[in-house]
From Swiss-Prot:
UniProt family annotation: Belongs to the GatZ/KbaZ family.
GO MF annotations, alphabetized: isomerase activity
Top-level taxon in the UniProt lineage: Bacteria
UniProt pathway: Carbohydrate metabolism
Name recorded for this polypeptide: D-tagatose 6-phosphate 4-epimerase
């Protein structure tokens, strides 16, 4: 089912650009929404895990790549999506989780992670060795990055061969700023300089050849660049096609390649469609999906507070605030300002750092309490309009809480599918 990925460049050259949404989340409600949408049209869905989220040592989700595949497959089975329509991708695979260690140790762990991803059945592999490790500059030179990426590619190639699996498709390069959105207000973001993009492509082609990996380079389908889209804590930098025109033109000299756009969260449908048209057809989205989940969850928290006398006054939001204050590691350093500003960012930031807390026992218990409070109850249309007015009434009226949450995420996915043409390919 990777044909859709392999045909992206040809579709652009033929003047019929098509795209694909890259769902970058391990949240079960987000995954269910994406899989349910794919099942409705029986089309492929691309689901990606990041190096910090899922790795051979467990990552912050506690899942190895094989665990993640099994987890997603179980949801797909429940939703009636054949396993062959699932495309698994690994994002930013490299030394990042261990960058505070010496390069040799970090890269050894990165290699083990890549091996685990490939043998688990991940077909789309983004290799990112751009970050410095202990004693190195924060940003490495291009030659070092390319050599490290080539070494990780060799690991992936060997893993696929030994497991009897198809060879992976590769994504190379990285974007600036770091993955997951900026941690400050951005007014504009400059697209990658066209010559820098050309140099990155040419250098990787040359160094892969030096490593005897020219065949693998033929399976590089995209390079990650910055087309000028980003989101900060409370603002979004919209895509400007004119500003990215010269960067898009680089692809005219690389007929087998497209660009991959990260941090497309919160872009409008016209902006996403323009990205696909201009050569950035792989649209990665993550925080924007869990943001929609949190919006709907907090709306239900308000509704339960209004409807159920024994529920209390927004106990879910209060639990999350207490939890984030007691374990600030996942937001501190990313949010800035006075106490009120920090509180607002903890809950409502576009960066959505709250997403790291939903799997903690206290959060799971609070969400379960909310579900139990509303299960079997009919929410009046007037309350739905008051707190969930952004969602079509037909999508939420008479629905259980879980279905409301799925509908909220699906509304975001619908914007992406309208822009990419998914479901119509």
């Amino acid at each position: 089912m990777t044909a859709i990925l392999e045909n992206l460049a040809a579709a652009r050259r033929a003047g019929k650009p098509a795209g694909i949404t890259s769902v970058c989340s391990a949240h079960p409600v987000v995954l269910r929404a994406a899989i349910r949408r794919a099942a409705a049209s029986q089309t492929a869905v691309l689901i990606e895990a990041t190096c910090n989220q899922v790795n051979h040592l467990g990552g912050y989700t506690g899942m190895t790549p094989r665990d993640f595949v099994a987890f997603v497959n179980s949801i797909a089975a429940e939703e009636g999506l054949p396993a062959e329509l699932l495309i698994f991708g690994g994002d930013h695979l490299g030394p990042n989780p261990w960058r505070r260690e010496k390069a040799e140790d970090a890269l050894t762990k990165a290699a083990a992670m890549v091996d685990a991803y490939v043998t688990a059945g991940f077909r789309k592999i983004h290799l990112d060795a751009s970050m410095g490790c202990a004693g190195e500059p924060a940003a490495l030179d291009d030659v070092t990055i390319a050599h490290r990426a080539a070494k990780l590619t060799a690991v992936a190639e060997k893993a696929a061969t030994e497991a009897g699996l198809p060879k992976p498709l590769y994504i190379l390069g990285t974007e600036v700023p770091v993955p997951g959105g900026a941690d400050h207000v951005l007014e504009t973001v400059a697209p990658t300089e066209p010559q820098a993009a050309r140099n990155t492509i040419d250098l990787h082609r040359e160094i892969f050849a030096q490593h005897g990996l020219s065949d693998a380079f033929e399976r590089v389908i995209a390079f990650v660049v910055q087309p000028g889209v980003e989101f900060g804590s409370d603002n979004v930098v919209a895509y400007d096609p004119q500003a990215a025109q010269s960067l898009s033109a680089v692809l005219d000299g690389e007929p087998r390649l497209v660009f991959e756009a990260h941090s497309t969260d919160y872009q409008t449908e016209p902006a996403l469609a323009a990205l696909v048209r201009d050569g950035y057809p792989i649209l990665k989205v993550g925080p924007g999906l869990t943001f929609a989940y949190r919006e709907a969850l907090y709306a239900l928290d308000m509704i339960a507070s209004e409807m159920v006398g024994t529920y209390g006054d927004r106990p879910l939001a209060r639990t999350m605030e207490k939890l984030m204050l007691s374990a600030p590691g996942d937001w501190q350093g990313h949010y800035h300002g006075d106490d009120i500003t920090l509180r607002l960012q903890r809950h409502y930031s576009y960066s959505d750092r709250i997403r790291y807390y939903w799997t903690r026992p206290e959060a799971l218990a609070a969400v379960s309490t909310l579900h139990k409070a509303l299960d079997g109850k009919t929410i009046p249309e007037t309350l739905l309009r008051q707190y969930l007015g952004e969602l079509p009434l037909a999508a939420v009226a008479g629905k259980e809480p879980e279905e409301v949450l799925v509908a909220a995420v699906d509304q975001v996915l619908a914007t992406y599918h309208a822009a990419t043409g998914e479901g119509r390919h």
